[in-house]
Amino acid sequence: MRQKLDRLLEQAQINLTDQQKEQLVGFVRLLDKWNKAYNLTSVRNPDEMLVKHILDSLVVSEHLQGNNFIDVGTGPGLPGIPLAIANPDKQFVLLDSLGKRITFIKNALRELGITNVTPVLSRVEEYKEQTFDGVLSRAFASLNDMVDWCYHLPNPQGKFYALKGIYAESEVQEIKNPIWLEKVIPLSVPELVGERHLVLLNKPN
């Protein structure tokens, strides 16, 4: 699996240390193991997880601006854990409303020695502890849902980072809250079939 990860990272032009690579491989192994009992992801094959979960998360890394981020509807820690491994200088809150997912994340953090992640079991609308430089998610079906549920989370300079498959302009027009579209970045994920986009949105100051 490590060789496959090395190859994918090289194709994506992402530079990581050996320790970071071992943490990513360890995370996939844990996800594969826990998935058999807890059904955390529909992706069953560890090699596929490297593409659809790890690389799909890591390609966002170079676009992150700021130091503290929240991953809303993180599921088993995606994109939060791969991004936290790749950015040990940044802090990540991983939010999910399902206990088994947070239990898995806590276990993974402990086993992999990841110290820059705080897992939180909560519904997003009830989480009011702090604001963030970036609100990340690949969980929401629509941009309107993401902005609506998470509108209280960015700080005044903060952004929404929506990880999407196909991007449709009409989705931005459907957003009810005041928002402006900063940019849409096409993402290239090695060996992934289909389009990926990162949509950056800002609240007006």
UniProtKB/Swiss-Prot annotation:
Keyword rRNA processing: yes
GO molecular function: rRNA (guanine-N7-)-methyltransferase activity
Biological role stated in the UniProt entry: Specifically methylates the N7 position of guanine in position 527 of 16S rRNA.
Residues that coordinate or bind S-adenosyl-L-methionine: 73, 78, 124-125, 138
Keywords noted in UniProt: Cytoplasm, Methyltransferase, rRNA processing, S-adenosyl-L-methionine, Transferase
Recorded GO CC terms: cytosol
Reaction equation(s) it catalyzes: guanosine(527) in 16S rRNA + S-adenosyl-L-methionine = N(7)-methylguanosine(527) in 16S rRNA + S-adenosyl-L-homocysteine
HAMAP family linked: 16SrRNA_methyltr_G
Primary location group: cytoplasm
Enzyme superclass (EC): transferase
Protein name: Ribosomal RNA small subunit methyltransferase G
UniProt xrefs under InterPro entries: rRNA_ssu_MeTfrase_G (IPR003682), SAM-dependent_MTases_sf (IPR029063)
UniProt similarity note: Belongs to the methyltransferase superfamily. RNA methyltransferase RsmG family.
SUPFAM superfamilies attached to this UniProt entry: S-adenosyl-L-methionine-dependent methyltransferases
Domain of life of the organism encoding this protein: Bacteria
Organism: Actinobacillus pleuropneumoniae serotype 3 (strain JL03)
Localization of this protein: Cytoplasm
EC number: 2.1.1.170
